Amino acid sequence: MILVIDVGNTNTVFGVYDGKKLLNHWRMETSKGKTSDEYGMFIVSLLSYEKIDVGKIEAVVIASVVPPIMYSLEHAIRKYFKLEPMVVGPGIKTGINIKYENPREVGADRIINAVAALELYGGPLIIVDFGTATTFCAVSSKGEYLGGVICPGIKISAEALFQKTAKLPKIDLVKPETVIGRNTVSSMQSGIIYGYVGEVDYIVRRMKKEMKEDNIKVIATGGLARLIASESETIDEINGLLTLEGLRIIYERNK
């Protein structure tokens, strides 16, 4: 069995695989203040609760976009699992030719998503990840990572609206029944949700034109993927566990 860990700006997701089967996964808030013991005891308690023997974990794979967390997390793995974690970064085999001007600038999560999507769906692809930031990644039919787009995430956009407009209330990110709002809350929900749907569809269409390939599949992942995909005209499929799957595949290519 292997433990995979995806450290994002907002949440950290843990998953355990037995071969290609995901046994379970858990989510916690990403916190820069946690000690290695806090991480270690948290992970061990999760596994114990699910009756997963810690001693049967053969490897740990970590991807992170939050560097300050890595020292404590890596130390936790060494202390509680007696393993040297595999950290996705330079030197790790991904099987993808990165066409970015500076490949080191590409976030590990974006490459991992591309690895998983190529394995599961084949190219060409556009991957839309609805995280703290929303990212769009273009992958060619040859398996090349072409580049992409980075936008403020839905929650960041909503928070900016709340903070900069004194009279507007905080609202839940819920899709209203109509675009035309009949009160302040539904008008704000409409602007945030349907405005974001329009942004996603426009960017995807432009990317498809620039990629100049046929049958480009669009895969959505991330916490708010279902909310947007339900209204999107361009998203073909949702896979909320794409990053965990990518970590498993990368481990197989590097073990």
UniProtKB/Swiss-Prot annotation:
> What is the stated purpose of this protein?
Catalyzes the phosphorylation of pantothenate (Pan), the first step in CoA biosynthesis.
**Positions bound to K(+):** D129
Q: Please name the pathway.
A: Cofactor biosynthesis; coenzyme A biosynthesis; CoA from (R)-pantothenate: step 1/5
Cellular-component GO terms for this entry: cytoplasm
User: Which cofactor does this sequence's record say it needs?
Assistant: NH4(+); K(+)
Q: Which reaction does it catalyse?
A: (R)-pantothenate + ATP = (R)-4'-phosphopantothenate + ADP + H(+)
Q: Which GO terms describe its biological process?
A: coenzyme A biosynthetic process
Q: What is its main location?
A: cytoplasm
Plastid among keywords: no
Report which superkingdom the organism of origin falls in.
Bacteria
Kindly state the subunit structure of this protein. Homodimer.
User: Which residues does the record give as ATP binding sites?
Assistant: D6, V7, G8, N9, T10, N11, T12, V13, T132
Q: Keywords for this entry?
A: ATP-binding, Coenzyme A biosynthesis, Cytoplasm, Kinase, Metal-binding, Nucleotide-binding, Potassium, Transferase
Q: Which PANTHER family match?
A: TYPE III PANTOTHENATE KINASE
Kindly list the places in or outside the cell where this protein is found, as annotated in its UniProt entry. Answer: Cytoplasm
Q: Which Pfam families does the UniProt entry name for this protein?
A: Pan_kinase (PF03309)
Alphabetically, the GO molecular function entries are: ATP binding; metal ion binding; pantothenate kinase activity
- Which residues does UniProt mark as catalytic? D109 (proton acceptor)
Identify the residues that bind substrate: Y100, G107, A108, D109, R110, T184
Its recorded name reads Type III pantothenate kinase
User: Which family does the similarity line name?
Assistant: Belongs to the type III pantothenate kinase family.
Q: Which CDD domains match?
A: ASKHA_NBD_PanK-III (cd24015)
Its Enzyme Commission number? 2.7.1.33
Q: How is the cofactor bound?
A: A monovalent cation. Ammonium or potassium.
**Which InterPro entries does this UniProt record tie to the protein?**
ATPase_NBD, Type_III_PanK
